[in-house]
Amino acid sequence: MLSPRLPHLLLAGCLALGCHPRATATGASSPAPACELGPASGDHQHDFDFEFGAWTTKLSRRLRPLTGSEEWVGYEGTSVVHPLWDGKANVGELDVGGPAGRIQGLTLRLYDPSTRRWTVRFANSRDGELTPGLVGGFSEGRGEFHDQETLDGRPICVRFVFSEVTRTSFRFEQAFSADEGRTWETNWVATFARVER
């Protein structure tokens, strides 16, 4: 049974398994220009409204990203997303399991009306620390969020993409780039199906 008490996004789970790197100690610096998105236009406060509610999810995670590895592991589980502040924020809980273990993660997404951008941050049950955020938004049904972080001591760009959004389903992908965003390697793919009540 899905828990509506605790708030998700599969990325928090990715962090829990080490495929989403933590930002460096220089987290106060802004992302590299190649990792940034341009300015947003229009009101995007309700971009994530489609995700409110309970979902089942199937996801695949690439082991050892940016090493040439083609080894993937699968997970299945649930996600529950709760709206806050009339859509200006939301919090979600992800709980999935598979051969590589269990992922329990919490996502916090906050909307900044002055920039018309969202910031996505994560915590996981392993250490409870809140990560620096990826910044972005939606355009023409596609959500894209970027950040610059480090992986094994080298700077990388991180990209989240939400796509194929309908009332009852959507797709999420995470990708890393070691060349300032010229090429991307996908390392996390998840599909979501709404739990009808």
Regions found by a protein language model. Name each.
Residues 20-197:
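Hydrophobic small-molecule pocket/channel-lining residues, especially in calycin-type beta-barrels
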Residues 1-4:
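N-terminal secretory signal peptides that target proteins for export/translocation
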